[in-house]
Amino acid sequence: MVAYRFLTLISLGLGSHCVSALQYGYNQLSTHKDPAVVAGAFPAINGTHLRSPAFTSPGTVSRGFSDGTSGPTRDETMEGFMRRLARSNSWMAYHEAGFKSEEGRKFPYMYLSASSSSVENPSSRKLRVWLQGGVHGNEPAGDQSMLVLLGDLAANQKWAAKLLEKMDILVLPRYNPDGVFYFQRYLATNFDPNRDHLKLARQQTRDIKELFAKFSPHIATDMHEFTAGRAFGPKKDFIYAADALFSAAKNLNIDEGIRQLSEKLFAKRMGKDIEAAGLRWDPYITLGESSSSKLLLREAGTDAKIGRNAMGLSQCVVFLCETRGIGIADQHFERRTLSGLVMAKSVLQTAVDNFDEVYNTIERGIRRFTNSRNDIVLTDKSPIIERTFGMLNTTDASLFDYPIDFATTTPAEPVLTRSRPRAYLIPPSWPDIVKRLEVFGVKADKLPYSYVGPVEALNVTSVTFDKEFYEGVVTTTVETKLVERSIRLPPGSYLVKTNQKNAALAFVALEPENIDSFASFGIIPVNTGDQYPIFRLK
């Protein structure tokens, strides 16, 4: 098995508890529960009543949960809970996806609607909301918060009815059932499911993305957990104080109006709702490398291989919602799950309370993006600013604001841009590229005639290989020069028009300079001096 050291070293989710080499199954992290002094800073919240199997049926909790070798809720327990809710509530429909995990496990999901709509035939003038958890199998508060949300909706019929007046909701609690079974971050094949959204290496990724594209949501959330015990400072005696870290989608090819809606309405409301629940939050970050002695934290990035940005590039509002939980087994599980629940409910309530603004802004953003002739962004940078970040002293549990350098992506700054093509031309010898685009929800027309005429071509001027493996490949940084030429392509070539909602996913995949492009991952291999085999129409 490949040791994905580059991935594990930079990942906040794994942090200092990373697995340095992988085997088949049970790639579990060591458990380091909070000592008593730290645990005292994360007490149970008075009045909390969570309606999901881990809390209402404690006898169903797996024995390994207490020592960090399993999650709390088995597949069959989760499925039974969901089925019972669906039988008792006409507006809840239990479904099993028409595909299986890599080891043959099911994907149950709930479709919530006050009408007779479906994934294939959604309600008109309603928001479509996609909620998912369990992408990483060792982050149990992610899927549990989705189950608690379902339980809350069933117990609060008036609130559910108010939501469903304005939206249809699809809840996929467990994105990675094999990872949950092994209590590991990865898929069964040891690919990271949250790094496969562009290259689409695994069929499971493709299947779920096709369901997502079919539903075509206006709003989505992705529920995760982050490492609890990552220590900082000269004495390694302080840790993140937050219960919750969150981030909107940041890629600059998402319509600016949609990004502004995410930051100025949803993010502000989410922070207030977390505080109102007696919890603490900060923006989602990863640890950066700095030449100075000052701690550098990087705000959630713009890379499209991450689910948050990949979903956002379909022109929707997306939030990554992370709770403090990796590495501490069952400790503070009620508080962790509550943190996820508060964030998910905040997104739903904000959308309903501001329905006209939210619906109209997203729909206008989709139209504006679809008809835009503005340049597209291929690479960007994160300006460094000074700010503070909430920390907790592990010796006395005191809370304090620690000064840091902060690489911000709110917003990122464009570095390399290029004119937006009217369409891409793909030769018939690349049907696998077209299939990937179709998984994204991008439409491609197969031409019954030869194409003869002018195109924009990209001549490769530089290819630089990374120094390490990344999920089994050596990624590349590609530079090109745009030239004009005439070309003859045979019948069966593909025309991918860019006046479509999901075209931004084609931009990041097909423009070679993008960090997550098909060229970067070797799906379309290129070398210096080559002419890139995908062509642009002005």
Swiss-Prot record:
Q: What keywords are assigned to this protein?
A: Carboxypeptidase, Glycoprotein, Hydrolase, Protease, Secreted, Signal, Virulence
Catalytic residues per the record?
E322
Q: Name one GO cellular component term.
A: extracellular region
Give cofactor(s), names only.
Zn(2+)
Q: Extract the CDD domains matched here.
A: M14-like (cd06242)
Range of residues in the leader sequence:
1-21
Positions with a binding annotation for Zn(2+): H136, E139, H224
Q: Where in the cell is it found?
A: Secreted
Q: Which terms under GO biological process does the entry name? A: proteolysis
Glycosylation positions in this chain: N46, N393, N459
Keyword tRNA-binding part of the UniProt annotation: no
Q: What is its main location?
A: secreted
Q: Where is this region: Disordered?
A: 53-76
Residue span, Peptidase M14 domain: 71-351
Molecular-function GO terms, alphabetical: metallocarboxypeptidase activity; zinc ion binding
Keyword Glycoprotein appears in the UniProt entry: yes
UniProt-listed Enzyme Commission number(s): 3.4.17.-
SUPFAM superfamilies reported for this sequence: Zn-dependent exopeptidases
Similarity remark: Belongs to the peptidase M14 family.
The record describes the protein's role as: Extracellular metalloprotease that contributes to pathogenicity.
Q: What is this protein called?
A: Carboxypeptidase 2
Q: Which organism is it from?
A: Trichophyton rubrum
Please spell out the taxonomic lineage of the organism that makes this protein: Eukaryota, Fungi, Dikarya, Ascomycota, Pezizomycotina
Q: Which gene encodes it?
A: MCPB
